[in-house]
Amino acid sequence: MNPMLHAVRAAAVAVVLASAPLGARAATEAKPYNIVFVLVDDLRFDTMGFLTPGLQTPNIDFLARNGVYFPNAVVCSSLCSPSRATILTGMTTRNHGVVDNNNSSEKGLEFFPQYLREAGYQTAFVGKWHMGEASDAPRPGFDYWVSFRGQGSYFPTDGLLPQQVAAGARQMLNVNGQEVPQKGYITDELTDYAMQWLEHGRDATKPFFLYLSHKAVHSEAKPPQRYELQYADLDIKLPASMANTEENNRGKPMWVRNQRNSWHGADFF
């Protein structure tokens, strides 16, 4: 285990136990905690209501008010797949080997939900996996599985030709190894699958771990119709460094300049 993580966890447990009555400690130690882990894709660090006035994220704001916020947290990589692999393995990119979004392999890696499952937890994964390849097949360590290939689609007909849509074709989800047509906006649908499992698909006598991995707000972001005009009147100021100008490029080698137009960080190597 990461020494820092171990120290933080030990300190947290110590605070809880120190403040608990003696009679309650045995019960506290005996009952495992349920865990819900929510991952949002490509969300800027400050695009939450409690950090930026005008943004409407009431549920995230509630968690910030009633939980712990880590203002100095960083990811091990600014790329999608390497970051996901680090979350699931606790390893740095050079150790787990998932170094890009398209050509890496997760073969031989072990994920922490496997250990939770061995410890008696019911485990569920719902959402975007995308860890170096496009497969949506169920992965080890999960009792319940809902995913899609690669980046997935915001809407069921995204990426399909008009004649395909007319013929009834839809983007597909993998639900416990079976192909199921996507029915609606992906954020809503993934949330519905997660809630269905929490309320009806598990054994309520056992602890659970739910990993809800949303596609949104990955570029090119497409909001559902009900939110299309939500920020129409909000004045959003873009950072000066965002512009692809001579001033921003001055003194930078070409490979650095090219990364400004890169989807996966290595498109020009």
Predicted features and spans:
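Bacterial N-terminal signal peptides that target proteins for export
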Residues: 1-12, 20-22
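Formylglycine-dependent sulfatase
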Residues: 13, 17, 24-269
